[in-house]
Amino acid sequence: MSKYETVIGLEVHAELSTNSKIFCGCPTEFGAPPNTHTCPICLGHPGVLPVTNKQAVEFAMKAALALNCEISRETKFDRKNYFYPDSPKAYQISQFDQPIGYNGWIDIEVNGETKRIGITRLHLEEDAGKLTHSDFGGESLVDFNRVGVPLVEIVSEPDIRTPEEARAYLEKLKAIIQYTEVSDVRMEQGSLRCDANVSIRPYGQEEFGTKAELKNMNSFRNVQMGLEYEVLRQTEVVSSGGKVVQETRRWDEANKKTLTMRSKEEAHDYRYFPDPDLVRMQISEEWIEAVRATIPELPDARQARYVNEFGLSKDDAGVITISKETADFFDETVKTGAEPKSVANWLMVDLLAHLNANNLVFADVKMTPKGLGEMIKLIEDGTISSKIAKTVFKEMVETGKEPKQIVEEKGLVQISDEGALRQVVVDAVNSNPQAVADFKSGNEKAAAFFVGQVMKQTKGKANPGMVNKLIQEVLNSL
């Protein structure tokens, strides 16, 4: 066991799903041609005046309330001064000493234990542009479409002690933000980004160690791997008598290690000052309560409902509710009359396996809740077997066809005619005298052999329960 304790704090940026930017009317649509969603305001031309997007403020309030934050009754925007090619104004409009939300928390669960992670602050700011570095010619290209897109930055307390806890925190945070529908939180499109501050210290020491900031982690898996590597690196440095240098490092996914980006000897002086072009905002109790009323059922409450109302295990309910899309699909399917535990099993096992195997996301699923509900009823009434249902399920997910249509087109109706199945069983028994002898000598596996033979002859369409019953009857009658 290491004699050093890990201390991790996370900074998460989530783009808000407003139709227009935070201080101008330019659209926020992802994937538009470079530099087509810009105007003099977001590009910082002289003489222009920004106007605050009210929906962005309310989305930030909604996220803050969902994360159990207190809301500042008075808040303002500040200029964060720095020069970088992706920031055309040479400053970023952010919030310094009066964030919109503060003193929040979320509960995470790791290895069956619940832990509360504090949230220092949640503040609004504008996004920067996107730089693309060319491998040839030494050129860097900048796309200003993203400049001015509203963000919330969510800063955790340094309460996280392991990379596993960091991943659990991110998954829970993403789920809560997704449930509020203020952001689509898609890391692959950059609408959710995470930086991590990590340090180590001897157990029992109150003072923090020297931290490194990790960037370029574009998935939760990479965040966990990057932190695991960095903790190991810092432990080796300190254990060998060296000192950890305060710096910014990036995760090199190809080589699975962190690399130095730049030294960070001391905190930047961004010379924050209140933006003179934007008025202070007074946030009334009535406004806060109006926003609070728009918050839907959140993951923890939904998980508890699934346990109490449908009898799901806490773990199964947690798997379903970690994604709003999956939870919504579950609810809609149950409304069709399908048995909740069956719905949960199909979603957790078969659907997730299909998505993972094909590198897909839930949005790629063409199956409808109504279709899944009908398929489960086909199993329950004996029209198809559970084995055949897997074939039907896969086609439903890929094509969106209704289950009855698939069953009819492929001739998948389960054979439950006892007379017809008895003849298949008798034929299998007559054709395999050695297996019969094995059964008679007490080898129960021989019965399973005959099940396989019958299923082979019926192309998997025989009713499994009836097949087992008939095999026992025929063999015991010999």
UniProtKB/Swiss-Prot annotation:
SMART domains reported for this sequence: GatB_Yqey (SM00845)
E.C. designation(s): 6.3.5.-
Alphabetized GO MF terms: asparaginyl-tRNA synthase (glutamine-hydrolyzing) activity; ATP binding; glutaminyl-tRNA synthase (glutamine-hydrolyzing) activity
InterPro entries, A to Z: Asn/Gln-tRNA_amidoTrfase_suB/E, Asn/Gln-tRNA_Trfase_suB/E_cat, Asn/Gln_amidotransferase, Asn/Gln_tRNA_amidoTrase-B-like, GatB, GatB_C_1, GatB_Yqey_C_2, Gln-tRNA_amidoTrfase_suB_CS
Bilayer-spanning residue ranges: none
First-tier enzyme category under EC: ligase
Top-rank lineage group of the source organism: Bacteria
Swiss-Prot/TrEMBL GO biological process terms: glutaminyl-tRNAGln biosynthesis via transamidation; translation
Keyword Isomerase set for record: no
Reaction(s) catalysed by this chain's protein: L-glutamyl-tRNA(Gln) + L-glutamine + ATP + H2O = L-glutaminyl-tRNA(Gln) + L-glutamate + ADP + phosphate + H(+); L-aspartyl-tRNA(Asn) + L-glutamine + ATP + H2O = L-asparaginyl-tRNA(Asn) + L-glutamate + ADP + phosphate + 2 H(+)
Keywords annotated in UniProt: ATP-binding, Ligase, Nucleotide-binding, Protein biosynthesis
Quaternary state and interactors: Heterotrimer of A, B and C subunits.
NCBIfam families: gatB, PRK05477.1-1, PRK05477.1-2, PRK05477.1-4
Biological role stated in the UniProt entry: Allows the formation of correctly charged Asn-tRNA(Asn) or Gln-tRNA(Gln) through the transamidation of misacylated Asp-tRNA(Asn) or Glu-tRNA(Gln) in organisms which lack either or both of asparaginyl-tRNA or glutaminyl-tRNA synthetases. The reaction takes place in the presence of glutamine and ATP through an activated phospho-Asp-tRNA(Asn) or phospho-Glu-tRNA(Gln).
Similarity comment text for this entry: Belongs to the GatB/GatE family. GatB subfamily.
Protein's recorded name: Aspartyl/glutamyl-tRNA(Asn/Gln) amidotransferase subunit B
Lineage: Bacteria, Bacillati, Bacillota, Bacilli, Bacillales
Gene it is expressed from: gatB
